[in-house]
Amino acid sequence: FYELDAINQARVMELEDSHAEKTKDKSLAGIIRTNSYPTLTAEGKGTLLYIFSRFNHSCTPTIMHKYNDLLNKRYVYASRDIAVGEELFSNYVDFYASTKTRREELQSKFGFKCQCTSCSATGSTSKVSDSNRSEIKRLDDVVYENIRTGNYEEANVSIEKRIDLLEKEDLATPDIMYRIAYDGYQCEDHRGNAAKAVDWLLKCRNYSRQFLMRETFDCLEIQKLLDERKPKISETNICNNKN
């Protein structure tokens, strides 16, 4: 901070300090604690980005973000179609948690009671949403365990359920769907169903291109898997035609 010029120091000090009772009590430490995000490779360290820190929170965000440690940049991507003039919302906490848990964490860490559309829902709507989000999280563990133990049919059923619930909660973001598509690929690949495995890989590639640069390791790895498996499908089709 002290190596910044006066203009950039002032920009940092304009940011919110959720740990100060009054604006005049803002501190540099409080601003950093409120606005910093952890990096992927440096434990206990984070980055403070002036523009990114301006995004408000929603438990049904319209944007997502990914940190590139090599470039020391945080990239922001749309998590769904966004209307002209619609506010861009990030997410500060685990959006699979219950409304009560999310609100308590946001109040404790950031000093505000969340009034987003998800948290403002009442009655049965709120209960259904909490149940859906809890089930989405549970199914993630179920899919992992079923793939690990070779129960691929059960894993596929859980994958489809998870996709359905994510869409209902408007949480089917490209990064989450990318992971789900990769789970689907693993199921079909282990079962020896080359055509369906490639279908899932194509979905992986499409989702990855919505939030990753094409030169990143994940994108290159998916393309490599596609290149390896497409010829096998052609060979299988030729054999089937001969039969």
Question: Residue spans of the language-model regions?
Answer:
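Inward-facing hydrophobic residues that define packing positions of alpha-helical scaffold repeats
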Residues: I159, L201-L202, S208
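Hydrophobic stripe of amphipathic alpha-helices that form coiled-coil interfaces
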Residues: L165, A195, Y207, R214-E215, ...
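Short, charged low-complexity intrinsically disordered segments located at boundaries
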Residues: E43, G192-A195, P231-I238
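C-terminal SET catalytic tail plus cysteine-rich post-SET Zn-binding segment of SAM-dependent SET-domain
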Residues: R54-R191, K196, E221
